[in-house]
């Protein structure tokens, strides 16, 4: 965790402006808002829910503002949480005492660990959820005054921001103005508006002003950020498939995908999930057909969404139109039919998002096996929206141009519930700490968390298409895993005072059992000959005795097998929870590789400890190329390590940066 010191502005006072209504207040002292709080969170999607809860856990008085309290926690697209890479983000959010993992365990209808056939470093916890239960339990969490005594929920729509210009090149946030003219004063504001900024929905050739079907977009915030403050904004697009009537689908000949016999909870607080293993709902697999592809190709001209190639959609979750254009030789694409809840008659067809006219959608759907008589309950659509170039953010997710303004979620160019929630919890923690005059900010390193990788990628390289998390993005994935997220991050959260006593107690108990068990295994040593005899295996002889911990490196070896084969092993397996046993088994397998990786981590950390001056004008370094000067001035990297990861920064430029860098103990240049 990097500790960032934030200094208060000492600039001369200039008038305060409520930019949407052009209200000008003569001085900062004369500003009298209708109501006052410490942190305002705009939007109650996945980023907003985590941001509001995290901010309140710091002790900051927090107000979550949303147009509809009944839509808090609404899942706009797929009815699932987690997956490869994404599931690790959920575990990290949970380790910081976030909500997503706990709510998923309550609302899940099917749990499955993806990538089981591969190494544990790339396992992906995933759950199908009941949409209505997810909303219900998320709303219950946020309304729990015992858990979040400092959190208030306000049903209203934010029209614009209230900014103060001290005249020193950047502004200061002072609150928001609502649609009804109410001014809410705040020390920090977090924008988590998802796909609602200047958004429009596309169905065929129709353009509809909406951020989600049936819900109006917001324009004032985009206008203020771009035209009044000077943020660089861009446009991205995404889409969602049609919702189908369950009774109109013939599942009899389709592939069945069941949940795991022993579901693995998303939250470290839980040993089990709410749904009984035998009562998990099935998913069903089908596929597109050549006939459907031909039909769709003949109708692509009817979609304005797919015709606009200047605005990028998600590469790794493309629409069916994009798949057919990108992979013309493929005769079929997989579709998973996912249930939307225990009592729901709605099916979500994962893998066939599109923006075709409604009549075309119905005809093409009926060319898919099992769906000859399918009925569409809600049409598929594409959505196009504004995002802010994330290179204008600090690692804390505070903006560089407006003090106290934080951005989280799809507004930063990401896609996915989990990526949004991960940003939300970091923005919420840091906004809350800042409002309480805390000098520390939570900035996770790439070597500490996938959240660190996510934010580091965004702020250094920006996005040209919606960003999605994968395990391949992390250089440290053998040590930064789903199973050990609590051991990595809960102590960091505890230092900041954001971890509940219940979670901290469980973490301490699990860590003690983990450490004691590994210590016992390291101290229990036998000769290679004795190990061979006990395990009925061929253990190569060596001069020194081998510890039980070393034996973990052998294929098919785990704690249960050791316990069964060695009566004298000084542990009681019955006293160790299954999730701790899993941690020990995985750590034992990866231990030799982690030792090697730690050498790389040390080299990585050396560059992370070389600090660069803040607000430095790199144009004064004559040996830098024009491109490098522009990149460095835009990103304003905090360290040599961060500068190294900016695309376009050359080795020669890095050599020059070492001249202006300093170690933490040295004064700022």
Curated annotation (Swiss-Prot):
Cofactor(s) this protein cannot do without: FAD
Q: Which Gene Ontology terms of cellular component type are present?
A: mitochondrion
Protein keywords = FAD, Flavoprotein, Mitochondrion, Transit peptide, tRNA processing
Q: Which InterPro entries match?
A: FAD/NAD-bd_sf, GIDA_C_N, MnmG, MnmG-rel, MnmG-rel_CS, MnmG_C, MnmG_C_subdom, MnmG_C_subdom_sf
The transit peptide is at 1-59
Q: Which GO terms describe its molecular function?
A: flavin adenine dinucleotide binding
Cell location? Mitochondrion
Q: Which Gene3D superfamilies match?
A: FAD/NAD(P)-binding domain, GidA associated domain, C-terminal subdomain
> What biological-process terms (Gene Ontology) are attached?
mitochondrial tRNA wobble uridine modification; tRNA methylation
> What main location does UniProt list?
mitochondrion
Q: What is the effect of changing residue 431 to T?
A: Does not completely restore mitochondrial DNA-dependent respiratory chain activities in respiration-defective mutant cells
Q: Which cysteines are joined by disulfide bonds?
A: none
Subunit structure, interactors included = Interacts with MSS1; forms the heterodimer MSS1-MTO1 complex.
- Name the protein family: Belongs to the MnmG family.
Q: Tell me, what does this protein do in biology?
A: Component of the MSS1-MTO1 complex that catalyzes the 5-carboxymethylaminomethyluridine (cmnm(5)U) modification at the 34th wobble position (U34) of mitochondrial tRNAs.
User: Per its record, how is this protein called by name?
Assistant: Mitochondrial translation optimization protein 1
Q: Which gene encodes it?
A: MTO1
């Amino acid at each position: 965790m990097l500790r960032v010191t934030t200094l208060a502005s000492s600039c001369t006072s200039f008038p305060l402006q409520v930019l949407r209504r052009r209200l000008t207040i003569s001085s900062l002292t004369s500003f009298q808002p209708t109501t006052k709080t410490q942190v305002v969170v705009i939007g109650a999607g996945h980023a907003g829910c985590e941001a509001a809860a995290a901010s309140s856990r710091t002790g900051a008085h927090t107000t979550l503002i949303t147009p509809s309290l009944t839509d808090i926690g609404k899942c706009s697209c797929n009815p699932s949480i987690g997956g490869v890479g994404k599931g690790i983000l959920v575990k990290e959010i949970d380790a910081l005492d976030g909500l997503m993992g706990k709510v998923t365990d309550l609302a899940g209808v099917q749990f499955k660990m993806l990538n089981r056939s591969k190494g544990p470093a790339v396992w992906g916890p995933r759950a199908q959820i009941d949409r209505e239960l997810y909303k219900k339990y998320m709303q219950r969490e946020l309304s729990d005054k015992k858990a979040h005594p400092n959190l208030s929920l306000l049903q209203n729509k934010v029209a614009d921001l209230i900014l103060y210009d001290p005249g020193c090149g950047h502004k200061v946030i002072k609150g928001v103005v609502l649609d009804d003219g109410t001014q809410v004063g705040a020390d920090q504001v977090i924008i988590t508006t998802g796909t609602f900024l200047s958004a429009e929905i596309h169905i065929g050739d129709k353009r509809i002003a909406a951020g989600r079907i049936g819900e109006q977009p917001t324009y004032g915030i985009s206008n203020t950020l771009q035209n009044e403050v000077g943020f660089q904004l861009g446009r991205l697009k995404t889409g969602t498939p049609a919702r189908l009537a369950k009774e109109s689908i013939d599942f009899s000949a389709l592939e069945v995908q069941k949940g795991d016999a022993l579901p693995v909870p998303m939250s470290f607080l839980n040993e089990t999930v709410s749904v009984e293993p035998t009562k998990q709902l099935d998913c069903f697999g089908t596929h597109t057909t050549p006939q459907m592809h031909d039909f769709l190709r003949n109708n692509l001209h009817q979609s304005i969404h797919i015709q606009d190639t200047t605005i990028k959609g998600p590469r790794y979750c493309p629409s069916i139109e994009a798949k057919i254009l990108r992979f013309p030789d493929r005769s079929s694409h997989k579709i998973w039919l996912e249930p939307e809840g225990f009592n729901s008659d709605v099916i979500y067809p994962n893998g066939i998002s599109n923006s075709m006219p409604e009549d075309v959608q119905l005809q093409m759907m009926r060319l898919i096996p099992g769906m000859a008589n399918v009925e569409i309950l809600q049409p598929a659509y594409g959505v196009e929206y504004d995002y802010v170039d994330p290179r204008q953010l600090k690692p804390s997710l505070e903006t560089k141009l407006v003090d106290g303004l934080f951005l989280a979620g799809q507004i930063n160019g990401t896609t996915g519930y989990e990526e949004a929630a991960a940003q939300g919890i970091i923005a919420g923690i840091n906004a809350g700490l800042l409002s309480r005059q805390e000098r520390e900010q939570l900035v996770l390193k790439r070597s500490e968390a996938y959240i660190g990788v996510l934010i580091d990628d965004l702020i250094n390289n920006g996005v040209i298409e919606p960003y999605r998390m994968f395990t391949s993005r992390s250089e440290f994935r053998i040590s930064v895993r789903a199973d050990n997220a609590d051991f990595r991050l809960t102590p960091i959260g505890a230092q900041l005072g954001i971890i509940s006593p219940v979670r901290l107690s469980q973490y301490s108990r699990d860590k003690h059992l983990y450490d004691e068990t590994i210590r016992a295994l390291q101290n229990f040593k036998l000769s290679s000959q004795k190990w061979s005899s006990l395990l009925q295996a061929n253990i190569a002889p060596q001069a020194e005795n081998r510890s039980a911990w070393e034996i973990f490196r052998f294929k098919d070896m785990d704690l249960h097998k050791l316990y069964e084969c060695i009566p004298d092993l000084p542990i009681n397996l019955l006293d160790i929870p299954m999730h701790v046993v899993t941690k020990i088994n995985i750590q034992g397998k990866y231990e030799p590789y982690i030792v090697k990786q730690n050498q790389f981590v040390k080299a990585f950390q050396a560059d992370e400890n070389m600090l660069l001056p803040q607000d430095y004008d790199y144009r004064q370094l004559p040996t830098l190329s024009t491109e490098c000067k522009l990149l460095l001035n835009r990103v304003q990297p905090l360290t040599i390590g961060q500068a190294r990861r900016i695309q376009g920064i050359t080795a020669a430029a890095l050599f020059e940066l070492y001249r202006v860098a300093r170690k933490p103990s040295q004064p700022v240049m």
